[in-house]
Amino acid sequence: NIEQAILSSPDRLVMFSYAHVPWINKRQLLLEKSGLPDNHEKQTMFDTAAGLLHKSGYQSIGMDHFVRPNDELSIAMQTKKLHRNFQGYCTRRTTAQVYGLGVTAISQLESAYAQNTKDIPHYIKTISKGELSITKGYALSPTEQLTREVIVTLMCNGCIDWRDLSKRLHVSVSTLKAATAYDEKKLSGFADDGLIY
């Protein structure tokens, strides 16, 4: 449990929600016999754990990471150099691209994603021939690349500074807003509920 994790005094902790995908992993069907927590129960577990971590001196990084105040992720967040890839939060200094090595591994490149085969014999055969063993790939359009940057910035900083982001990406604010279909009027309900300001 979280109290035991805190006692071991790690520098970082990450809390991900359990992914129940029995159509991929048939063994997970066994868990359904015991019952799985609903969304409200999962949120309560997360909130309880986050509260205990905060009381123990950890600070939240983004949506699911908790670190000591002197951790490089904390420093990156304070200096707006925090980044996130599909594996979690990291510093921009350490995150240009992610290269997936091995069966089912996923690569995240500047303008594309690729996944290696799930078939071990096929993977060994193609790699032995000096070939890549990619079975799925997706090339991001320029608009999708902009959208990804806006989403990552929001996930890392909790806000969007359109002017700062436009300077960093060398595009206009109107281009960024168009890429994300940004419409301030559509956000008014969230503001009314206190979710954004």
Task: List each language-model region with its residue ranges.
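C-terminal scaffold of the Radical SAM
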Residues: 1-176
